[in-house]
A protein has these predicted regions:
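Alpha/beta-hydrolase fold catalytic core
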Residues: 1-62, 85-87, 123-124, 308-309, ...
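Conserved alpha/beta-hydrolase catalytic His-Asp/Glu region
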Residues: 30-33, 164-166, 189-254
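Conserved HGGG/HGGXW glycine-rich cap/lid loop of the alpha/beta-hydrolase fold
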Residues: 48, 54-99
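Active-site loop/oxyanion-hole signature of alpha/beta-hydrolase fold enzymes
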Residues: 53-56, 91-133, 145
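Flexible "cap/lid" loop of the alpha/beta hydrolase fold
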Residues: 143, 152-189
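Acidic catalytic loop of the alpha/beta-hydrolase fold
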Residues: 240-242, 265-270, 295
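Short beta-strand/loop motif that positions the catalytic acidic residue
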Residues: 255, 261-263
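Catalytic active-site module of serine/aspartate enzymes centered on a nucleophile-bearing elbow/loop
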Residues: 284-320
Length: 320
C-alpha cells in the first residue's frame, strides 16, 4: 500500500512539474510578440474597415493591387512593392486579416468589398497580384467582374484542383474553438501561446521550404496573424476553402483576363501540378515555373515584378 501511495505521489509531483514547465515555457519561449501599430491607411467599405498600404509610383504603368494569402498581411509584399515604382501600387489586408476588421468574411463578400474599395480609391483596371488564397480571390474577382482587371499574376495560387485534407479542417475547427472568449483567456495564460508558436514554426518551415524562413515574416505572423480576429478569419476561410476553390475551378474557362501563373517547383502547400493545371485551363495564361517553395513573394520578388510589367505592357484585347 505504501508503495502505491509513493508511486501516486511521485506521479502527482511529475505531472505538477510538467504543468509548471509548460506554463513557464508558455510565457518565455512561447510568448507572442506585441502587435505593432499599423503604418498604412484605412478605408471604410460598407461595414468593413480595410487597411492598405499605398506606393504612389510615377511611371504611368497600370495600377497594381497586391493580395496576400491565408493568412497574411500587407507586409508580405515588402520585397515586391519597391520593384513596382512605375505603377501605383496598393497592398491590402484582406477583410479579417492584418489590421482589417471583420473576423471571417465569406468569399463573395470579400469580392464585393474589393470592388467597393477600388471605387473608393479610384483604382481603374488594375493588375491583381494574388499569392496563395489571394490568387483564388483574384480569380474570383476576374470571374465576377469581367473586364475590370487588366491582368492577373497568380503566385502559387490555391486553384487548379487544390484541396485541403482532413488535418487542415480539424486544425481549423480547433482554432475556431480556441477563439471562444473564456477558452482563449485560459489557454493563453497556460499553454496557448506555446502551442501557437510551435504550430507557426512548423507551418512556416513547410511554407518556405526549401528556403530558410524569413525572420521578419515569422515575427509578423506571430504578432498580427495570431490575434483573435485574424484567427477567426483563418479558421473560417480554411473551412470554406475547398468549396470556394472547387467553385472557381469550374469557372476558370470563362475568365478571359490575361494571366501569368508563377509556381514554385518545390511548393509543399500548393503542388506544382496545381499551377500547371491552372495555367493550362485559363484561356489566356502562361506558366512560369520557378525554383523554390510557396513563399515566392520573398524568394522571387523580381519575377513577380517582371510579370506585372509584362501584363502592363501587353495589349488588352483579351481582357474581359
Amino acid at each position: 500500500v505504501r508503495n502505491r501511495i509513493s508511486i501516486r505521489k511521485l506521479l502527482a509531483i511529475v505531472l505538477a512539474a510538467l504543468a509548471v514547465s509548460v506554463v513557464v515555457l508558455n510565457w518565455t519561449y512561447g510568448r507572442l510578440p506585441a502587435e505593432p501599430k499599423p503604418t498604412g491607411s484605412f478605408a471604410e467599405v460598407g461595414k468593413l474597415r480595410i487597411h492598405y498600404g499605398e506606393h504612389p509610383g510615377g511611371g504611368g504603368g497600370a495600377p497594381v493591387v497586391l493580395i496576400h494569402g491565408l493568412p497574411g498581411t500587407t507586409g508580405d509584399w515588402e520585397d515586391v512593392a519597391p520593384l513596382l515604382a512605375g505603377h501605383r501600387t496598393i497592398a491590402i489586408d484582406r477583410p479579417g486579416f492584418g489590421y482589417s476588421g471583420g473576423g471571417y468574411v465569406p468569399f463573395a463578400e470579400q469580392l464585393q468589398a474589393l470592388h467597393e474599395l477600388f471605387a473608393e480609391l479610384h483604382i481603374v483596371h488594375p493588375i491583381l497580384v494574388g499569392h496563395s488564397y489571394g490568387g483564388t480571390i483574384s480569380l474570383g474577382y476576374a470571374e465576377r467582374y469581367p473586364g475590370q482587371a487588366r491582368g492577373l499574376v497568380l503566385v502559387d495560387a490555391a486553384a487548379g484542383g487544390q484541396h485541403g485534407g482532413g488535418y487542415e479542417r480539424a486544425q481549423a475547427h480547433f482554432v475556431k474553438f480556441m477563439q471562444l472568449p473564456v477558452i482563449r483567456q485560459i489557454a493563453n495564460a497556460t499553454f496557448g501561446q506555446l502551442l501557437t508558436t510551435v504550430s507557426v514554426n512548423q507551418r512556416e518551415d513547410e511554407a518556405f521550404h526549401p528556403e530558410a524562413v524569413v525572420a521578419v515574416h515569422h515575427r509578423r505572423v506571430l504578432a498580427i496573424n495570431m490575434t483573435r480576429g485574424n484567427l477567426e478569419a483563418y479558421a473560417g476561410e480554411m473551412l470554406a476553402a475547398n468549396g470556394v476553390v472547387a467553385q472557381i475551378d469550374r469557372r476558370l474557362t470563362s475568365i478571359q483576363t490575361p494571366a501569368i501563373v508563377i509556381q514554385g517547383n518545390a511548393d509543399e502547400l500548393v503542388k506544382p501540378a496545381r499551377g500547371r493545371r491552372l495555367a493550362a485551363t485559363l484561356p489566356h495564361a502562361r506558366l512560369e515555373m520557378l525554383y523554390g517553395g510557396h513563399m515566392q513573394p520573398y524568394s522571387h520578388p523580381a519575377a513577380i515584378a517582371a510579370a506585372v510589367g509584362a501584363l502592363s505592357a501587353a495589349k488588352t484585347s483579351t481582357a474581359g
